[in-house]
Amino acid sequence: MSSITNGEIREALAQALNAVPGLNIYRFPPEDVNPPCAFIAGFNITPLTFDGNRETKVDVTVVVSHKHVDQIVTLDAMLDSDGPWSVVDAIESATPPGMNFFVESIGGYRELTVADVAYYAADINVTVRT
């Protein structure tokens, strides 16, 4: 079984997100946000897979302003498979020691309320194998 901790996985994902210029990164679901941003939300862990590894499914939520509907364009760019604003590319390009990141699904576009303020948001579901 892997000796890599949940905290190390969270930190490695946060470091991967640093590749996106101007993106505010929250390692935990925040009480307040400054968009554009991404936060690392919940974990679902399979301690021992068929090949003896640990598999952690991580929800990463990306958030943009709700002030103008054209912010959906920014959200789209964050969810594209490549490009300077691609959160997906930042995650898939990361090579932290002892970890492999795989983007499993992207979507769930919605309005998200944080601290009584509405934002546009979507989810990136990441599988981390250690």
PLM region spans:
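Charged, amphipathic alpha-helical segments and their flanking helix caps
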Residues: M1-D32, N44-T130
